[in-house]
Amino acid sequence: MSNDFEIQSYPLTVRTNRERVTAFLAANGLRLDALDYYAVVTAVGDDQILAGGGLDKNIIKCIAVSDTFMDEGISATLVSHLMSIAMSRQYEAVKVFTKPSNQKIFESLGFHLLAEAPKAVLLENGLSGWLTYERYLKSLRREGTSGLIVMNANPFTRGHHFLIAQAARQVDTLFIIPVKEDCSKFSYAERKAMLEVGCRDLENVIVCEGSDYSISAATFPTYFLKELDEAATTQMTLDLNLCAKRIAPALGAKIRFVGSEPLDQMTKRYNELMHEILPLEGISVVEMERLSERDRAISASAVRTALAEEKFSEAAAKVYPTTIPYLLAKLASMALQKELDSSPKPGLVDQIDAGAHQDMDYSLMCRSIHALHPHFVALAQLGYQEKLPTSEEMRRLGLEAEREMLLATNNVNTHKGALFAMGLVLIAAAHNYYIYGVIQEQPLRTAICRLASDFPAPKGTHGDAVRRQYNVGGALAQAAAGYPDLFDNWLPYLRQLKGDTFAAHKTLLYIMTKLDDTNVLHRKGAQVASKVKEEARALLSNFSEAELIKLNQQYIKENISPGGSADMLSLTFLLNAILS
């Protein structure tokens, strides 16, 4: 490319840039896909787009060159630029999703073909990538007849286990490849772990590592958008081509199993194409009826809907038993996020401001929740057994969670109080479900009491000093009593506000009227703590958002943060969902 032209980053977050790129791609028979980087080639001193291309992580997409300026030198320079950006992100392999007419250009730059469809090709360049994954798959091969299932398991349901068990009976070895793309409600790590623990009773099942080569942003991006169109059909064809010519042969799999799909049109079309494409490469397709209840297939989407609506019992009825701890952990993280998102709040971090905190903000709190989530799973799994765990077992997991939280927040104590309370409830709830197959209030309260009573009172902490100075119970005493205020007052109060836009805010204020908040006592003393209760009571009796905003501004000036009340609000949200 001559010095008369230049490559420049072209942020698509700028509306005018996005509109120009969309129009440029449309003129070249393409549409704008989801991208996190885009670059354009222009003449020096001119802003007319002559060529452009983008990245979605390590996948080059939306490559186009103006018909009036078909210069392969520009194409090569543009692709080299995009490759360097991808490599700077620590990716060792770069993929490109493009039109077949561009295949030779990319092959001249060291790319090799992975899969093809009539209207698109997928190529790759790099030292690792498919060859590394192929070696891994070949290492898993077993003697005898092998089959394959590609599964999202978002989350792992009784229906998933039913399909796997049915397929496993028909082969000597059954390989499960979980979808790796992390744009599901449950992360890839969680979904893979759910599959592994859920299939332990099936000796001939091997859960493989997922990859970018099965239902991913590279092979099938519209799967995650659920947009059934011509582009989706092209992507399905590419994905199935990869399976037939590369993945299945690497595993030695001769059968691909799939569940029937009566509802989702995207998956239904994918199954139809599977029957057309895979047999051409000697791979049989076995489509099995899904497990149904009341004439409706058990689906992961129904579980996700129930979780979004905070209906644990409805979600739990559909999942495989080993998935229960993951549901409880998800509800715990959702409860923390719901408390954080409730805005405005008096003196507390929310989406608007940091309240009375100088060392915290919204993004830091989000990082803290994200860091705690895997440990919520571990705590729930600890409780999911016949016997309640010991205080030492709980303490060990709690300290691990606290270390991860502090690492994520640069040693800022964002959720230590919430971690203790939620950890106890998660363990108790998981234990109750394991024993009774349901979570009911009284057995849950009893289990919380037993767990908390085993904990020694902490010494040398701010909470310990506050308890001694002001003769208040604190977090451990509340838990050892089974959270009577929460179960008897705060939870019923939240539930009677169902449908109220300000239910969370009013419940927070109601908690503030009752709780001896050790955060407030530590910061400001007993007199201010009493004043906080009175102010919450007054605002609650004559509530308005404007007055809530004023109270927040006042608490920011006075350095008042009712953090203990925020923890109890999160716990109230969690118990409301668990006991739904």
Write out the residue ranges for each language-model feature.
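Phosphate-rich cofactor/ligand-interacting catalytic cores and adjacent structured alpha/beta frameworks
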Residues: 325-391, 395, 429-553, 559, ...
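Conserved acetyl-CoA pyrophosphate-binding loop and the N-cap/start of the following alpha-helix
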Residues: 69, 73-81, 159, 163
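Conserved beta-strand in the GNAT
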Residues: 42, 47-64
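Conserved phosphate/anionic-ligand binding catalytic regions in large, soluble enzymes, centered on
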Residues: 409-426, 559-573
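Short amphipathic alpha-helix that is part of the acyltransferase structural core
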Residues: 1-32
